[in-house]
Each structure stands twice: as C-alpha cells, then as structure tokens.
Amino acid sequence: TGLSKGLSIFSINVNGLNCPLKRHRLADWIQKLKPDICCIQESHLTLKDKYRLKVKGWSSIFQANGKQKKAGIAILFADAIGFKPTKIRKDKDGHFIFVKGNTQYDEISIINIYAPNHNAPQFIRETLTDMSNLISSTSIVVGDFNTPLAVLDRSSKKKLSKEILDLNSTIQHLDLTDIYRTFHPNKTEYTFFSSAHGTYSKIDHILGHKSNLSKFKKIEIIPCIFSDHHGIKVELNNNRNLHTHTKTWKLNNLMLKDTWVIDEIKKEITKFLEQNNNQDTNYQNLWDTAKAVLRGKFIALQAFLKKTEREEVNNLMGHLKQLEKEEHSNPKPSRRKEITKIRAELNEIENKRIIQQINKSKSWFFEKINKIDKPLANLTRKKRVKSLISSIRNGNDEITTDPSEIQKILNEYYKKLYSHKYENLKEIDQYLEACHLPRLSQKEVEMLNRPISSSEIASTIQNLPKKKSPGPDGFTSEFYQTFKEELVPILLNLFQNIEKEGILPNTFYEANITLIPKPGKDPTRKENYRPISLMNIDAKILNKILTNRIQQHIKKIIHHDQVGFIPGSQGWFNIRKSINVIQHINKLKNKDHMILSIDAEKAFDNIQHPFMIRTLKKIGIEGTFLKLIEAIYSKPTANIILNGVKLKSFPLRSGTRQGCPLSPLLFNIVMEVLAIAIREEKAIKGIHIGSEEIKLSLFADDMIVYLENTRDSTTKLLEVIKEYSNVSGYKINTHKSVAFIYTNNNQAEKTVKDSIPFTVVPKKMKYLGVYLTKDVKDLYKENYETLRKEIAEDVNKWKNIPCSWLGRINIVKMSILPKAIYNFNAIPIKAPLSYFKDLEKIILHFIWNQKKPQIAKTLLSNKNKAGGITLPDLRLYYKSIVIKTAWYWHKNREVDVWNRIENQEMDPATYHYLIFDKPIKNIQWGKDSLFNKWCWVNWLAICRRLKLDPHLSPLTKIDSHWIKDLNLRHETIKILEESAGKTLEGISLGEYFMRRTPQAIEAVSKIHYWDLIKLKSFCTAKNIVSKASRQPSEWEKIFAGYTSDKGLITRIHRELKHINKKRTRDPISGWARDLKRNFSKEDRHTIYKHMKKSSSSLIIREMQIKTTLRYHLTPVRVAHITKSPNQRCWRGCGGKGTLLHCWWECPLIRSFWKDVWRILRDLKIDLPFDPIIPLLGLYPEDQKSQYNKDICTRMFIAAQFIIAKSWKKPKCPSTHEWTSKLWYMYTMEYYAALKKDGDFTSFMFTWMELEHILLSKVSQ
C-alpha cells in the first residue's frame, strides 16, 4: 500500500512452504496484496532452508526456523518502507520472532507467534510475559494463536476456558487489545475451519497497544485458497503529512507481443489522426495529445485483459464468500461440500496459473543460464545499493529523518544547482571574441542543416537500446520499434514543424531525476548523490539524429587531446601519453614540473546555456541545427523522484541535459574553449618533448594538465580557469584536484606545495580506472599486481555461486577478461611469465571450484573443439595488446601523440618506416623504453615464427624507403599511387610489372624513362620478387590492410592463437580407439558441430560437451589415478569400467538404450544400434532428415543425463526418469518458442510426433 496511505500489516498461517508451487503462490499473493509487513506462520522450513523464502520487493526477511520441518515463522518487510532492524529475538524451535526497528517514518516492533496445538493459551501467555520488557506502545503482536480470545471467535459459541481467560488477563495487563474485536465487537467472522469438529473459529489474531489505538485504521479477514487458514490484514494511519506516492505509468512491453493489442493500437493511431490532424491543430500539441490518448488506450486494454484473465476466479471467489457467510450462520453438510468443491476448483486454477508462470521463468533460465547473459551478470555483480533516502543533513549539519524535510532539502538543493543562470551575455561575447576556435565550412554547416528525413528517424528507432527505463511519459523504446511504420510519418511531420518553428512539444522538455548514492561516500550529505535523468524516448530520437550529424564533423572542432566520446579515440591514448610524460620528467636533471589532475565540480550540471549556444555560433553552427539546439535548451524541466514521491518540478537553467545523446558532444565543444585558452596561453608552460609541447589530456571533464615552471604556470592556469568559469559556469574543486610535483630538492618541493591550492600526492593518482605513478617503475606494482589481487578477490567472492564449470568460464570472459584487457591496453609494459601463470592458476581454481581439472586447458582454449566455449588465455591477449602498437606506427596518424613522445632519442618519423619497410640501422630505442621497444621485440618474434620478412611484403607502401631510396622523382611516386594503389601489390612485381591493369599500363607512359628503368630493376629483382610477389598473409593484412583500429586486438589475438596451438590429447581420437574406428576430417567436423548446435540451452548442451570431451571419471581412470588394481564397473556387472563400457556396453545400460531405440521405432525412425549416434551425434549418411536428427538428439541427450545421474549406482537407468527429462526439455522449449516470432512452427515440427508418446508415458 505504501506509507502514504498508512502502514499495512498482513498475517497468514501458510500450512507449509516446502513445496515450490506453494512458495510461488504465496509470493504471488503478497505481490497482489502489497502489504508493507507480511507475517507468516507455520512455514515448516528448517534452519538450512531459510534461502527458500524469497519475494521480489520484500527483501528484508527475518525468520525463526527449527531443526525439523515443523513450526517456522517469518516477517517480511517491503523495500518501499526502508526498514532497518535495531533488535531481533528468535525462538530456536521456530514458534516466535521479535523484530524491532525503524521504517523511514516511524519506529515499530513486531512479535510474530505460532502457538503449538497443545496448551496454546499457556504458550502465548508465557511468551508475552517473557517479552514484556520488549513490549511498548509501538508493538504489534500477530500470529496463529491456535486459540480463540472471545466467545464470538467460535461458531459453537462455547464458553472460554480458564487458560484462555488467564491469557486475556495477561494481554490486558500488558495494555494490549485484540484489534479485530475493537473494530468489530459483535461480528462473527472466522479464519479457520476444523473439518474434524465441523466448526469455524478465529484463531489468528492481531494485538495492538491501547495507547496507540488511534493509529489503527482498518482490519479485515482476507480469504485464502492455498492454505487452510484465512489471512488477517490491518492498516495503520500515518500521522505524518506526506506527499502521496506517485503512480507513474510505464508501458508493459509484454503487451506488445499480443497481436490483438498491436492491431487495436494501430487502429487507435489511425482513428486519432483522422479525427484530429487538421490545419487548426498545432502539430506539437497533436503529438502530446496522441501520446495521452494512446496511454489511455493501453491502460484500458491492460485492464480488459486482466479482467478477462481473472473473471472466472473472481466469480468463484464471490460465490465462495457468499456460501461461507451462509455457512457461518446456518451450517449444512451439502453447503460445506460445495464450499470444498469451489475451493478445490480455485486451487486448481491458481496452481495452473502459477505453474505456467514458473515454467515461463524456468524457460528463460533454460535459455540463458551459464551463458554470458543476465543471470550470470546478476550472480557476479555487486548487490545494487538501495536508493531509498531515509536521512539527510540539514543546513545546520544535523541529521533529519523527517520525510517532508528531506524532500524540501533535496528539491531546493537541485533546484539551486540547475537554476544558476548567468545573464552576463556581453562578457560571454567578449570572452569568445578573443578565442581562436575552429570553424566549420559552409558545406559542413549545410549538411547539418539539411531537413530531417524519414530514413534517419527509422534508423534511429531501429537502433534504440531495448529494455531501458522510459521517460516521464512511460513509452518505451520497444513501443516505437513495434509501431515504427505508423510513427515514422508522424514524427517526420513533427520534426519538420519543430525545424520551422523552433518549438518542441511540452513533453520533450520533461525529465525525471533519480538520486543514486555515490559509492563510498556519506549518504547523509546531499552532494553525495548522483542525479540520473530519464528523458522521453521521442525527445531522444530527435537528439540522436542531431548527434549523428555533428559527430561526422566533431574531429574538426575538437583537438586530439580530448578523447572522451570522440569516434576513433580511446581513453588509453591519454593514459599512455601521461606515462610517457612522467618518464620524460624523471629523466631530466633539472626538475620544476607538475602533473595536475583537475577535479571539476558537477561539470556537466554547471555549464551555462547562453555560453554553450554562443560557442556553437562561434564555431560556425547556424540555421536550423542551431535553432533545434536552442529549442532543446529553451525551457527544460525536471522532477526528482524521491522514495517513490514525485517532487515539484523545477526549471533546468544550466547544465547539459542528462540522458541526452547530444550532451557529451556539446560538453566537449564547451570544454574545448578552455582547452584552447590553456594551449594558447604562453605563460602556461607545457612539457617539451622533442618538437612537441604537451599541456593537456582530456576525457570529457577528466582533465590532466602537464606544467613546467610550476609556480608561474599554476598561477596563470588558475587565472585562465577563473576567466573561463566566470562566463561558462565551470568550477573546479581545488582540494579534490591532485598533483605530482617534480623538483630538485625537498626545499623546492615545499615551496611549490605552499604556493598551490591542490592536494599533492606522493606516489600515485587514479586516472580513467588505472593508477598513474610518480615514478614509472611503480606501474607494474600499482596496476598489474593490483589487478591480480582484484581478480583473486573476485573469484573468492564468486566461489559459491550456483553455476557449472561452463558458466564459470563465461564469468571469466564476461567479468575478468574485460578488466584485464583494459589494464593491459592502458599500460602494456613488460610483465613476467610467472604473472600470467599465477593468473591462470587463480582462474583454473575458480573454474573447477578448487578441484582437479577434468578437461585440459589447452582443449578448452580451442573454440571448435570445446563446443563453442573458449577459455581465454590472458597472456595471449596481453601479447596482442603489446603488438597492436605496430598498427599505429604503420598508419602514422597525427593524433597519436602518445606514441611519438615516448623516446626522445628516436626521430618520431622513424616509426612510420618500421613496418614492412627497409631495415633501419642502429635504431635508438633507449634503455628505458616502456612500450615501443617491447612492441618491436614481440612484433619481430611473431614475424619470424610465421616465416615472414618484417621489412618487405606485398603490402609495403609505395612511399617506403625501398622506393624512395631509388631516388625517383616525386611525380613518379604520385603517378604510381594514383594508378596502382598505395602498395607494391598494385605494381605487380616480376614479369607482370605494371601490366596487370589498364591503369598501370597507362601509367607507364607517364613515368620518366630513367625512373621506369630504376623501378623495373627493383621490381624484377629475384630477392624482391621472392618476398613480395605473393598473396599477403592475414598477419600482414591486419597491420597494413585495415584502416580502422576497431577489432584490432581480436584480429591479432586470432592469429596468435593459431600460431600458439598446443598439442593435447584429442578426445575424438580417444573415442576412435574405444570404438575401434577411424574418423575422417568430415566426421570430426560433424562431431564438433554437434557439440555446438545440439541445443540452444547451455545446460543441455553441456551434457553433450561433457560426453564428447570424455569428462566423466571411470573405474579405469580412477584406478590409474589412485594406482589401484580394481577397474571393475561400478554398476556391479563385473566388466572392465572403460568409458565406452560405462556409456554403452554395460548390460544395465544396454538394456536402457534398447528401450530408447524402441521409442525410435514407434516414431518410425530407423537407426542402427550404434554408440557413435547417441554419444557423438554422428548420424548415418542416409539419415538426411533434419527433423529426425533434431528429435533424436534431444532423446539421446536426455538419455545421457539419466545415465550420468546413475553413473555409480548398481541399477538400470529408469525409462520413466528419461521421459520426465524429455518432458522437461519439451516444456522449456515450448515456452521459449512462444516468446520468439517464427520459432513455434519449428518447435512443433520437431516435437509433434514425440509429444503424443511423451503424454502417454507421463500420464502413466
């Protein structure tokens, strides 16, 4: 109900929760009733079963369970009330529990009791007396007392016994009272029917303190079908003056899978446009009205579907209530019989519904479990911090828990933060007039201003991310994708009107802000929350179109010092740049330098809109594009959603809009003004390395400044930032900004420290997720060793997660590999082999759960041989990252400053001529080279292993030293590049020199005679032809063929994997020996493919992978390991326990397989009785039918499961268990197919024939 309406408490005796179906029904019931506190009695759960009780939205669960499956009670607190316990007391036998604590509004204590059937009044009296010191005015006692408290509590109207009277006396002495009798002194309503005595009674009670009676608002008995008791629910008034919890509508995407709903909405869209789209209607208002109409239609459709679904249940429940009412006043055996019948009907309906829900949920896990998907991610990620804010510090630095005051404090804080608007337009213009900003050309501006097209809208809708929270209007991305054909023309007209008028629909300005606590920060301080904003999807579509346009020209506007949100730029560029600068400073004899990491105060939120708009004008943006951005920032508003309450909206007069795809680029453009000011200010001395002066590195608002002549440069830097801040709104936290200081002595360092307002750190600072160290020799320790420690801690946290070894491999790929790649990418320094061996050991221990591996790691590293599952080799990824620097050398891009400044001894131009070019004599790498020398060593080693010449290749550039050293004219090289391409491959070496293409033949006549002779002599030389007149290898293509670094690591890693193949025992060869057969190359391919394609579910495919890879231990293998002479079959047949024997030859197993083949014959499938078919998926060549293969594969894998389950048991696997497993697979695939368009036909085709046989077997 939520505390806005008061606190609701619900109590129910559930009569056992060991059945999963019962637990699901209870959870479903709680979610429908939505009590704030739910008290459960007689759960029959034991101490070890406490994790079985879970209800989404009620995660604070306190239980008292005994050692046996008797008694057992629990109290569940809704997440919405933010309950924090202060005192808990439990009964070791599970008969009572006391929990005291605070909700976000009030203190409360609950005593939940389940009295035993024998001497119940005495037990209650003793329990309450024993806890009398804990009972206060805030206490509420609930539970199944197993005794009435008043004469009216029994249908027999029998007098109360002495024990009950004594109990009532104790209750009165403790100032407690029966709340139900206080509200209904003369009413006869019961919670339990005793079939043995044929009587009704109210033995479930809620007691409250007399001093607090005014808080109790309502109490009622709630009929319950799944238990033999009815529930009892009480509502308490909330005396605090609170805002009502906001009910925000959000489209249920499941409705979009219903074709009837889709058709109805399409009709509604057409009808709305026919009635309202006319010249008198403003199109912006038309669109907002359309959304309101469609929202109403969705609500009506959902209500209709819900009513239709529950109609039968509601009719039966109404009839049941009427019969029970009549039965209370005038009992009749016939009526009792009808009541029992209706309850049974209701139970059957509800059970079917819950089973369907369970199967849908199971089928989702069936498809996704152990894969790189949501279930695994949920298992490994940290528990999400609850965003409930129950206390905050006020202006006097005192903590307040008053909800109204919390709401006021936070709303005022964010209103002030976003409403700080500068009006100094003249100062802004003067400041920007003095800035030398780059400008877009007229043609580029025209491209920005071209009319929005329907194809742009359709493409943007298609690429919207799915399963994301919608904005205030509640319409999701899936809504726009489902009705794309209908909505694109409407949005096109809307956007065209916006382009003409410069006015957005009102809903485009709206946003909801949710506050998320910053990790590791004091949650009682208002500034320690991160505001997350949600805009409406239609506004995002428009903004994304604008983003796509400006992104094409952003590199012309933004300097390569900025790498955040810039296409083709990566964060590690600036990390490498910073490390190279640090290394350079450390080499200097005279030091007066500083590396400063500037912390901006809410940088995105403080940017002033007038400054941003004028900056856009300064870089040449004008016309329609500028008009649209001005419209977006003309009057945006936001509402904070705080603990479910929507606070009063306020205008956003500063800051880029959160959740808007355009915001990062606009912010970068605004930040570029400051970056240019710093670069152009000569008094701010940067670090000089060779011909480069390095001053800045930026990733959005993360800024590092490199300074020489520290005191004077810092003074001027602060002046420049202050001037910028005065017009832009940008502010820095000087105390949070950290710096490395480099001086010649301690006295000089102290002088610098005293003169700057920043925090000086002695050893390290964190930047973009890695540690920069003051001395580069500490990089390995602070990053590589830290990474190893983090991985070890992570796998230790995950050691008990419920997933198989395949799931653990995927966890490594999903959670460990990205982290490792990021660290290696940022800092690819030399690391010892022992480091990777340690990582491998940690990972293998995790995968096999501290047990001995049952499959060789070399086998698991081969994707094709491991059923599509690959165990990542971190050392190979590391090598790939180290080598990839060579690609950047070959491309010689101007933006790669990070690469050129590493080594002062080497001419930066040299790097361009290292790859596939004439050898350079005496390369001066320098003994301290961190990255490039290590890359070069590894690059050469791989080329040698591939038997490739690292200096000459078909992809050697025409402007290489090989050609330039021929002293050709510049015009000749230009002609060659225009006619034959950029590489030697286009020239055609040897006898076909310049004769392969018409363009080449034509070019010959243009080349100077002596140049042609020199060129021909070079291109026909035997040593050149032998090395370069061939098809380029994949390795050569990686570095010289691809123009983008996207996927570069993957491509290099793929080649390195191919080179580093390690020999291991081939499981297929093992099967060949056992089966005394030879498998051809095609057979092996079929077996490997069968492992990968046998099922869409990894839990099913895992069985086939295990079988093919010879995973299971056998008596022969165990005897070899333990050096025991006993190799006999564990099933007791006396045979030698080889793998083939355990799977096929054992008489008990053979009998089972014959039963399987009998079913095959029933399906009219004729297959030879051969183990290679069920165990390896190698079907006879004449078995062409894919249907037969699909259904047989499912049957055989189910059989493998049953055999593996009884692996060491001396019995024949059960055919009943096999059919049950098949039925489970059928059910899971059925629900999975229902969710996917087009899959159900395939499902029916596969299972149609087998379904009839399964039904007959299961029913037996």
Swiss-Prot record:
CDD domains this protein is in? L1-EN, RT_nLTR_like
Residue ranges of every copy of the DUF1725 domain listed in the record:
1242-1260
| InterPro entries xrefs | DNA/RNA_pol_sf, Endo/exonu/phosph_ase_sf, Endo/exonuclease/phosphatase, RT_dom
Reactions mediated catalytically: DNA(n) + a 2'-deoxyribonucleoside 5'-triphosphate = DNA(n+1) + diphosphate
Keywords from the named record: Magnesium, Metal-binding, Nucleotidyltransferase, RNA-directed DNA polymerase, Transferase
Give any GO molecular function from the UniProt entry: metal ion binding
Q: Where along this sequence does the record place binding of Mg(2+)?
A: 599, 701-702
Output this protein's name: LINE-1 reverse transcriptase homolog
What is the source species? Answer: Nycticebus coucang (Slow loris)
Taxonomy of origin reads: Eukaryota, Metazoa, Chordata, Craniata, Vertebrata
